[in-house]
Amino acid sequence: MQRTNFGEMACSIARTLDVIGEPWSPLILRDVFVGFTRFEQIQADLGVSRKVLTERLHHLVERGVLERRPYDRRPRYEYVLTEKGAELVDVLMVMVGWGDKWLAGEAGPPVLYRHHACGEISRGDLRCAHCGEPMHAGDVDVLPGPGAG
């Protein structure tokens, strides 16, 4: 079955889906954002097959969202967010806010974010609920929330 090429549509949402629309891609970006930068770490956290993870990482590197950097002599590689990828974290944070509001359940959100600028705990959002400052990749520490289980 041929996948639709969203990248050629005259729509920014469709073009963004062409980059992160595969089911594992947003979760891989989330993992890299929270500090799982090595293949084995990402695979262990997500439980995704090596083949699928390899394909997704290659796609995200090819699209300029992740950068592949050697970290050992073998060589082995880790994956880091590029500027383009760090800005996609803002999209993920909007998804977190929606999911926390509509899908978290009685226990509450599974993840909380400590904003570096003010030190306060905030939920997933583009702005800190306490100081109102923007929250981007690198501006927060990720902590287990009450719904982490």
What are these regions (language model features)?
Residues 1-8:
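N-terminal intrinsically disordered/low-complexity leader segments
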Residues 11-49:
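N-terminal helix-turn-helix DNA-binding core of bacterial DNA-binding proteins
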Residues 21, 72-94:
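Basic, amphipathic "hinge/linker" alpha-helix immediately C-terminal to the N-terminal HTH DNA-binding motif
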Residues 26, 63, 91-102:
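Alpha-helical linker/hinge and terminal dimerization helices associated
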Residues 52:
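Residues in the helix-turn-helix
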Residues 56:
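Residues within the DNA-recognition helix of helix-turn-helix
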Residues 61-77:
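Beta-hairpin "wing" of winged helix-turn-helix
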Residues 100-149:
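C-terminal regulatory/oligomerization modules of transcriptional regulators
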